[in-house]
Regions:
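Small-residue (G/A/S/T)-rich helix-start motifs and N-terminal tracts that mark the onset
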Residues: 1-119, 128-142, 147, 151-273
Length: 273
């Protein structure tokens, strides 16, 4: 079989304008499955990323022992205490799973992905629960690994990944039927047929929590109707743009994930220009 030519995408996708008669149900119910003892901040940042990304409703599902801490992180999202059954989770249009969830949650992650047929963003600890060949879905999953996580998925050293980021990302996305967002300088987004290399962002974003914000942001864009490739591409661009705006105000050295959240509104406005 002939491999189709790779399309290089240069334009940043846009969200459609909101209708005047719309309501919160039109902009997606996002369920964030994240957090554990010592990592409640990951759940908060992911939930807040979904809110800033425009989701109509956000619920953060986390272990009961951190639920009160997570609930205090933002009054605009709801919380839900996780059980050991993915089938008990509240209904959602989009699921983001992984940030701070813990490596012990593999069975739960696999159960969740088996129960939920809609769009998913898989990040962080949830990636460790999966192996190549297990990603096939009716709606392509969005995977957001950093180079170390991607190296495990492809069974290659990190040095090999960094030496051929685009080539390995495209091949993996094509084989597995996913949208892959490979983080790092020049984030690569590909569905195996199209590819874009993100041009926004700066070294100040190399700090804990920034990836959690990105996961929530992409989930929100999916909830508003963007297809997986477009949601990942716009998410990467807006996330990096927020980082660039934040660096102007606080500098690269002092930049935190909360600064990204503060500047996401301006970044999304800029994406429409």
């Amino acid at each position: 079989m002939t491999t189709p030519p790779l399309e290089r995408v240069l334009d940043v996708p846009r969200l459609p304008p909101r209708r005047g008669d719309s309501h919160k149900g039109d902009y997606g119910r996002v369920l964030v499955v994240a957090g554990s003892r010592g990592f409640s901040g990951a759940a908060v940042l992911c939930g807040r990323g979904a809110l800033r990304g425009g989701a109509g409703l956000v619920t953060v599902a986390c272990p009961r022992d951190v639920q009160d801490v997570v609930a205090a992180g933002d009054p605009c999202f709801m919380t839900y205490a996780l059980t050991d059954r993915a089938g008990d989770l509240p209904k959602a249009d989009v699921v983001a799973v992984g940030p701070g969830l813990g490596l012990h949650a593999g069975d739960f992650v696999r159960d969740l992905l088996a129960h939920f047929a809609g769009p998913v963003v898989i990040d962080a600890d949830a990636l460790a629960a999966l192996v190549p060949g297990s990603f096939a879905r009716s709606v392509p999953a969005v995977l957001t690994p950093h180079p170390g996580e991607f190296a495990r998925l492809v069974g290659r050293p990190v040095t090999d990944v960094q030496a051929d980021r685009e080539g390995l990302a495209v091949a993996f996305a094509r084989t597995e039927g996913v949208v892959l967002l490979l983080k790092g300088s020049g984030t690569v987004v590909t569905d195996g047929v199209r590819v874009t290399t993100n041009t926004t962002g700066n070294p100040g974003m190399a700090t804990g929590g920034c990836g959690d914000v990105l996961t929530g942001l992409i989930a929100a864009l999916l909830g508003q109707g963007l297809p997986p490739f477009e949601a990942a591409a716009l998410g990467a661009w807006a996330h990096g743009r927020a980082g660039d705006l934040a660096a102007v105000r606080v500098g690269e050295v002092s930049l935190t994930a909360v600064d990204l959240l503060d500047h996401l509104p301006a970044a999304l406005i800029a994406s429409h220009r």
